[in-house]
Amino acid sequence: MLRPQVALIAAILTTSSLYAQSADHYTAVSNTAMSVTGDVWLDDFGMTFENEEALEFSDLVADHFLVDNRSLPGSVYRVKVPADPELQNGNQLCGSGDVAYVANWDAGNGLTAIAVFTGKRPPKSSDEMCALYTYQE
């Protein structure tokens, strides 16, 4: 009787592990990233955190983003089901509401910046973020 349930659980765990393996891996380098998210796996479909919590994206809403008043190539994704997941050390991704958008851009020197946003409208600039994390590509 438990065999089908065990098989289903195993399939779900294998699928989430395979997803993380197919996405690009980013190593946490900023103090904030190391203490909140740990390493992350990111692609056009979602973001998985070191503790295996994840955010799924519904669509790409912008391919450029204002950072320090400069337009940079980057990606702004809408989160399919906004959430503020509990990550490492009991910390939350944003801490001030559900994350509805995630943006990432090249921060130079082999680094990637990932910012998270609350709100109903897509963010226009980094000034609107609730948290910023930096990773090594």
Language-model-detected regions and their locations in the chain:
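Bacterial N-terminal signal peptides that target proteins for export
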Residues: 1-7
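Hydrophobic helical h-region of N-terminal Sec-dependent signal peptides
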Residues: 8-14
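Sec/Tat signal peptide C-region and signal peptidase I cleavage site
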Residues: 16-20
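Short, solvent-exposed loop/hinge segments that bridge or flank secondary-structure elements
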Residues: 22-24, 28-56, 80-103
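N-terminal glycine/threonine-rich, aromatic-flanked beta-hairpin/loop signature
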Residues: 37-76, 114-132
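Beta-strand-rich cores of mature extracytoplasmic or soluble domains
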Residues: 78-137
